[in-house]
Every structure is written in C-alpha cells, then in structure tokens.
Amino acid sequence: MRSGPALALVVLLQACANTGPGPLPQGMAAERDLRGAFRAALCAPDRLAGDACARVLRSYDGEVAAPRPPAASPAKHRLVFVPGFLAACFRGIHSFEDVVVKAREAGFAADVLGVGGRNDLATNVKLIAEQIERLTAGDPRRLILVGHSKGANELLAMLIARPDIALRVDALLAVAGALNGSPLADDLYGLYGMTVALMPFDGCDRGAGDPVAELKPAVREAWWGTHGSALKTPVYALVALPDWSRLSPSLVGFYARLSYYTADNDSMLRVQDQVVPSSRLLGVVNANHLSVAIPHPGLLYLLVWSPVPFPRPEVYMAAIDVIAAQSR
C-alpha cells in the first residue's frame, strides 16, 4: 500500500496527466481498434466539434484516422439499455435518460430495462430476457445492447444463457463495463455486506444472490474462461477515464483506493477492467464512472455529483453509428 504522501502525489500527477498523446494505458489491447472511426463520428461539426470534442475524447498514440461512418438507421436497429449496479436504488437516478430521449428523437425505438439494483447476474439475466422478449415481439429489427458497468456483465450473461435472443443481437456496447471486475470488489466486499447490502432504498429491495462477489476479478476471469469462446456477439468498449476536475465528490475516496493499483481509473474500475482482448475499442472518454451513463440528478445530489457536463447523447449516438457501420 502507498503511504498518504505518495498517494497524494499520484492524485496530483493524474490531475495533470491523461490529457494528451501518449501510449494507451496498459491492459487496453483489443481485437479491433476503432478509435479513428469513433472520433470521426463524434467530432463532426454537427455533433461535437473542435475544442468541445477534444475535452471529451482522449487522444493516444496509434489512433488511425478514418472516415465518418454513415448514420445508423432506426429502421434496422433497436436500442436496449441496462443500468449498472445500484443505479435503480437511488431516487432521482435515471441511467441513460438523456440518451434515450435523443435516440427517440432520431427515430429509434429505445428502452431502458428494469433490473434489480442489488441482484446477482442470474436474477437480472432472467428479467432482461423477459423484457426483451416482450418489447421486441414481432419486431424484425436487429438489437444493439448497451450496458453500463455491471449491466454490461448482465447482458453478456444473457447472451450466453439465451442463444435465441443472441441471434437477434448485432452488438453489445459496454460503457465503463465491469468486464474484468474491479479490485474494489475484493477490497470492499466485507464493508458492502455490512452497509449498503443492508440499507433500505426506495428503488430496490435487498436483491438476490451476491452481486459484489461476482465483480471480483478472479470471478470475472473464471467467467471469461468458461464462456468467452461461446460468445459470438461483438463487444464494443467505451472506456471512462476522468480528469481530476470531472470526478464526482462522492467518488474521490474510491478513486484514491483504486489509485493504489493505478491512477488510470474512473473511480470504480481501472481502464484495463473495461476492456477484454476480444472487444473492439471505440475510445476513452473524459468522464467518471457515474457521469458517463447518468445525467446529473439535480439539487438532491448537488454536493456529491460532478458539475462538469458530459455530452452523453452525442457520445452514445456516435458509438451507435460506428457499431451500425461495422454490422453492415
């Protein structure tokens, strides 16, 4: 473990780092590098031009310029979103809300599925499959699934458990996906069991199973070893890595804890937790683990949420364009 002064130095260095060209952080090797296509889609003048895009999308060595992909077609694809761990539990938290509004304005059928905020994978997989069957009955459009944090893992597990649904899916977009788990699941497992696991929440019950245990890196490694070869759906990774100014106050302690391992973290996951070798890397965005998927929830969270806006609708729709182009 690092001493207090050493940890403070790490935090200070991170505040000044990760803003310009340099090598990709360790552990981010992917099957396909689509950073150039994603930049072309996001940084277009009609979406997020110039300095605004540079503040949101990080640059690293090895990115190859690519033409802007054509806009995705609402006639071909339907969008399905799954929130992350605990998101359903807190009043005023609405994952993907602004993204869904934007997608529907563009003509897409887009839905956020209801899952238990403290459920294990198996329980939420069943809920996800039931909702997809109900919402898409009779709809011939292909599905693009979008999962935040643990929601990405639940979608992965659903694709394995329900190959009939997987046949209708063109892609899974993992947004700050906990694909490889997180060291925090090991470090804070006991604390979770004595606190958050027992607390009453308006939006969720105590849930089923042991969701934090399923986020331990060793458990995720075992999952990939068992199921990775059976997964045929392409997984696209959108990685979150915030500047110090974009950390939510409520996440600073978690960021500091993860900094014992690496400063390249979004306050809940290291960057290498968000990518697997078989995934397709879209890019690294300057956002913390919450802001990358959840709009600012208002005055109730004023003192615990980052005030720096993040253009989720533009980022997600650019990602959908790239994914749709790859699916043609």
Per-range role (PLM):
Residues 1-5:
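Bacterial N-terminal signal peptides that target proteins for export
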Residues 6-14:
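Bacterial N-terminal signal peptides
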Residues 16-91, 97, 101, 105-106, ...:
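Flexible, membrane-associating and regulatory peripheral segments of lipid-active enzymes
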Residues 70-143, 197:
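Active-site catalytic motif of lipid deacylating hydrolases and related acyltransferases
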Residues 82-85, 149, 177, 240:
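Glycine-rich His-Gly loop
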Residues 93, 183-188, 246-251:
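Short aromatic-enriched loop/helix-cap "lid" or pocket-rim segments at secondary-structure transitions
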Residues 126-225:
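Serine-dependent carboxylesterase/thioesterase catalytic core
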Residues 230-328:
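C-terminal catalytic-base region of ester-bond hydrolases, centering on the histidine
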